[in-house]
């Protein structure tokens, strides 16, 4: 008998040990990410063919202390490799791990290769060749700290490669993990099984193979142990033949039904092809369908629902996924009372959207990603109970009620004002610390960074509830909900892009057509708190030469142009925003030489500018230290210097509309008087209804020459 290591994923060691015991192994001992045992050739052949959970089996030839490359070489060269494989066989070394002395796995593999080759040469035998592409033999080395395991891989390519899945959907599960999920789900071979998000069908195919008692390796054509010196072909042929007979008989005896749904027709075709290659196509019924609306099949008494829904990149906070899990949970309760469900996901927050209490849960890894598998018993409930539990105001009821109230008040006002975009919630309740803006049929939810004393998991769960409630209360489609995190921006971060979606839309504001981008930047291209300021600028602009500084996307310029300005000059440092401003003007038919656009540092431009203007709008940042600006700018510190330069450009009867977002900004009235300027605070007059709770969102001043 030889010593073996069955390799598996962390968390599956005990399950694999149970499986090996059922396959006739007497001393299966779980270790980290594996199971140790002794076996004859016949036993290990059977394990390789029948194990659903092991990723590979390694014949352990040596375990040793490895504190240097010489330790590695000596341990390798001391093994009689001639007894393992013939010199005509090609081999490769799979070296996993490093330590302080062996810092590179390629170097470790080279030392092992040297030891093996030298062993053959010492016996006056030809050197076996290396082949990374098509090796006959794979040498397995695992190094952790100063402990090393050296052996021969018995299988070759990982055992998850069953041979039925050459292609898959976007996020495939490994077959070994899929088998583990099925085994942990509580499903038994007599029960019907349904996967409402089946993708390429792996979960269903693995379950169907279990029900048919089909060996998972039965379709596999090549095994490394067939190239070893002690290979017993007659024994192996008998084991394979027995497995083939069992599989043929098993498929005919399966009584349970398997159902797979997916909303991607192309992926469903892949699933059907995979099932056909696996030999279980007649057992599985694949249909086009959505998990949020899936209905219970007729023959599904005591059935089990198992699935691996999408997780997303930013775990637990994608509006579309939150809506999917919420709707799926509602559908499970509405359609599948008396059944059980087992859901595998990396996001506990998303699983919470199911609104079901798990009876069992397990931790597993999907590759390097930690995941949860939760098992649920779905209670039988009346329609009234389901409606009451999952109604629009059942999630975060305080928040939902406030949002509903705000929508009634602000929505009516916005319609009257001819506004497509407005704020319906702005951290009204401290525990629900977000802002929510409507852009036509879209929602933008901006999460303010949670205080450091709020645990991250609690903040995530609360945000999940906010998104779920917002979708249900507003009726906005989940794929039209955009989530952003707003926190204090510093340095370059304040200008960084968030994504590359580049999906623009046109909104209406008091008759002006304005282009917004809800996805790519923290801000959308339109500061909603200034809608009344922009309208006033339009009313003041008739016949005026208008200057817009720190212009951003030029929305104020659009209002001025539509209001009858004789000319407009739009200045911003960002070429991206300046091009955006040009697009805004074009969308409103404001085209011509009288509309100028200048890419420049506004502060430097001001010092050199020579023109004269009747109306100037300036909305500088509170603070800026852009690498393209020579000096930093602080609006409180520098506003008088700013006014001095603006005065020079302002005609005798002209007006400056000066705004900024610094809370508690104080105009230096004494210095303004010395400059010969009058300043009047009009902040309360420029505050729209949707920002009425946030009195300090901006401050706004009308500045004129002192009469």
Swiss-Prot record:
SMART domains: THUMP (SM00981). The keyword Iron does not apply. One of its GO terms (cellular component) is cytoplasm. It is an enzyme of class 2 (transferase). Keywords: Cytoplasm, Methyltransferase, RNA-binding, rRNA processing, S-adenosyl-L-methionine, Transferase. PROSITE patterns: THUMP, UPF0020. Specifically methylates the guanine in position 2445 (m2G2445) and the guanine in position 2069 (m7G2069) of 23S rRNA. InterPro entries: 23SrRNA_methyltr_KL (IPR017244), DNA_methylase_N6_adenine_CS (IPR002052), RlmKL-like_Mtase (IPR000241), RlmKL-like_Mtase_CS (IPR053943), RlmL_1st (IPR054170), SAM-dep_methyl-trfase (IPR019614), SAM-dependent_MTases_sf (IPR029063), THUMP_dom (IPR004114). The gene is rlmL. It is found in: Cytoplasm. It catalyses: guanosine(2445) in 23S rRNA + S-adenosyl-L-methionine = N(2)-methylguanosine(2445) in 23S rRNA + S-adenosyl-L-homocysteine + H(+); guanosine(2069) in 23S rRNA + S-adenosyl-L-methionine = N(2)-methylguanosine(2069) in 23S rRNA + S-adenosyl-L-homocysteine + H(+). Belongs to the methyltransferase superfamily. RlmKL family. PANTHER family: RIBOSOMAL RNA LARGE SUBUNIT METHYLTRANSFERASE K/L, RIBOSOMAL RNA LARGE SUBUNIT METHYLTRANSFERASE K_L. This is Ribosomal RNA large subunit methyltransferase K/L. Its main location: cytoplasm. CDD domains: AdoMet_MTases, THUMP_AdoMetMT. GO terms for molecular function: 23S rRNA (guanine(2445)-N(2))-methyltransferase activity; RNA binding; rRNA (guanine-N7-)-methyltransferase activity.
